[in-house]
Amino acid sequence: MPSHTLTLVLAAKRGTGLDPLTLHRPKAAVPFGGKFRVIDFTLANCLHSGLRQVLVLTQYKSHSLHKHLRDGWSIFNPELGDFITPVPAQQREGLNWYGGPGDAIRQNRYLLERSAASEVLVLAGEAIYRMDYAELIRAHRESGAQVTLAVRGRREPGSSVQPLVMADQDSRILGLTAPQADAAAVPPADDALATMGVYCFDKSWLLSVLDQGGEGPDEDLGVDWIAPHLGTALACGYRFGGERGRVTPDRYWCDLASIDAYYQANMGLLRAEPPLDLYQADWNIRTYQGQYPPARTVPGAVSGTEGIFVNSMLAAGTVISGGGVNHCILFTRVGVRDGAIVDASILFDGVVVGEGAHLRTCIIEKDVRIPPKERIGFDRKQDQERFTVSPQGVVVVPKGYRF
């Protein structure tokens, strides 16, 4: 069944809510969980769901994303008609770049027309979750709908800024509304549903919608494309986390809408019973892995104190030499020097924490070198003068920062 489906992964957005982490990369390429990129979760879902024809629509500062796709996801055999292919704006529908999700699909209409697929699965490549798309496609076919969208309970953890869905007891969509600016402050009803950025279209119906559409960015496919056609087309909802197609018991979904959401999603991985279990063996998340030696701890060269880490994730190539790491996520090739202390922080690839430095509640970008004796995360006013500080006090030291 998935062999009859063409998959479009939307990965063109910058994702300004994650600035400054998205100053030099799109949201889909932001590191997550000690070794992954955000897009890996969507692509892993495609892999496990049997989807083998995947187009990744890219645009904003896409080099790092393209490199990651090349290095980590060149796993399909094109001789069998399988592919994961990045598609930057081709300007076939004029001389404009992608104006939004809908415009990105519109500009690649020719790829839909040349495909033999009967369905088009459209996925946002910027959220963290596990999902069996094959079951959604099966439900779509069984219902006879022109479009099926994945929905989740708005009371469930994740995001409060997704469009709201009204559905009847037969899962037929009756309405879609854009979220209000103050939606986070309004407690949702017990049965309130929200979209997830997962849509299965009949290709013929999608092409007819493109024929009728204008030239706007169509920022939300549900509100801008599906809602106007509810009177003439059958749209159904597919409940995420239901018994059908369940691949994980947690119903976890997070769109990383802000620095605080990103930080909490990462820190949640360190719980004894994490809301998202990266160690689930039957639905592993694939990514590119550099050829680095194992992480290790060694005594400090001067103090002789053993390097230690507690309740933390350490990626390959990381060395703690006489320092202390507590409740942290350290990506590859991180160095924590003699006497340095790192608490409740996320350190990207190649970060070096100098001797005697102390970091607390920080996100340190790739290749930043923290000087000896530096203190970050203890004086909010001082931190705001130098770095980005989130509403909840997470300090982000941007890429390329020099002390």
Located regions from the model:
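Left-handed beta-helix
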Residues: M1-L8, S204, D211-F403
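Unchanged
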Residues: M1-L270, Q384-K399
